[in-house]
Amino acid sequence: MKAVICTKYGPPEVLQLKEVEKPTPRDHEVLVKIHATAVTASDCIVRDFKLPFWHPIGFMMGIVVGFSRPRNPILGMVLAGEIEVVGKKVTDFKPGNQVFAFTGTRFGCYAEYICLPEKSKARYPGDIPSVMTFKPSKMTYEEAAAIVYGISLALYYLNKGAVHTGQHVLIYGASGAIGTTAVQIAKHHYGAEVTAICSGANAELVQSLGADHVIDHTREDRLPAGKRYDFVLDAVGKKKTSPLKLACHQALTPNGKYLSVDVGNPTLKVEHLLLLRELIEAGKFRAVIDRTYPLEAMAEAHRYVDTGHKKGNVVITVTRDEQKVS
């Protein structure tokens, strides 16, 4: 089968398309034919692993993903595809089922096939288990692959922030994969009033997703006078600072919470994907895809994501089979 291999850490050029052996599922595993995956920020961080191993985060990351090179040379954390073979002890899936999944630190999605356990649990400290369920019938494989990463982080932080109906929520970096998901979940699931911070070029996009107010960070360095927020989600992370981000810290209510996506250890549960599928079927959630690349152009896709200017998600089409969308 074809797979994109990463045998050392570095720039996008370390990603190489190769022919590798097609995996065979064990008794509790399924073989998934991958139709689409996505290039996430986490994929790029792993590929370009730069933290020194003496640094606490660098050491822990080395344990999880590999010190001198990726433990699994096939990166990629999200997929949408079709089950081709099931192990003899698998009970919930059968050949022909269309699924979408988050493979966590198992990675392996930059390939035509992957074996995943029917049910997964952490294998060692810091490991993020895989999660898989049936693909939303109203979505293409590309759309389904696009939404998995955002929900894995957005829902974790919104839950941690105890967001609920009527609260004022501020999302900094609202036009990326995490931000576009957080806007929709905060508005349509939790019933919050949502203020989105993004560039003016993306204002129309985030408003169409449900944002009640939009602040253009390229033109504003302060928040509306007197406005206070119950929850602020920094969907960009601490690596980027600005006067406007500082103002977000200062605009919390007395019991307000500020959370950044680069702090914590998010885990995705099957229940999260089921909630997402429910919102999709009800027309309350949609995928946001910026660009789509073929598997052969993986390095180019990584270069684009590295710019930090993508809107929503960058998707990789792995298999171009026809698919039915109801």
Residue ranges and their predicted role:
Residues 26, 94-95, 140, 164, ...:
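Residue-level recognition of short, solvent-exposed, well-ordered loop/turn junctions
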Residues 2-4, 16-21, 33, 81-82, ...:
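Residues located in well-ordered beta-strands
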Residues 272-326:
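C-terminal hydrophobic helical "lid"/dimerization subdomain
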Residues 21-38, 51-105:
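Glycine-rich beta-strand-centered segment in the early N-terminal region that forms part
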Residues 170, 195-198, 204-265, 269-270, ...:
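Glycine-rich cofactor phosphate-binding loops and adjacent beta1-alpha1 units
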Residues 94, 143-216:
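Mid-domain Rossmann-like dinucleotide-binding core that forms the NAD(H)/NADP(H) cofactor-binding site
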Residues 96, 111, 166, 211, ...:
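Local beta-strand N-terminus motif with an aromatic residue
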Residues 66-78, 85, 98-173:
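NAD(P)H dinucleotide-binding glycine-rich loop of Rossmann-like/cofactor-binding domains
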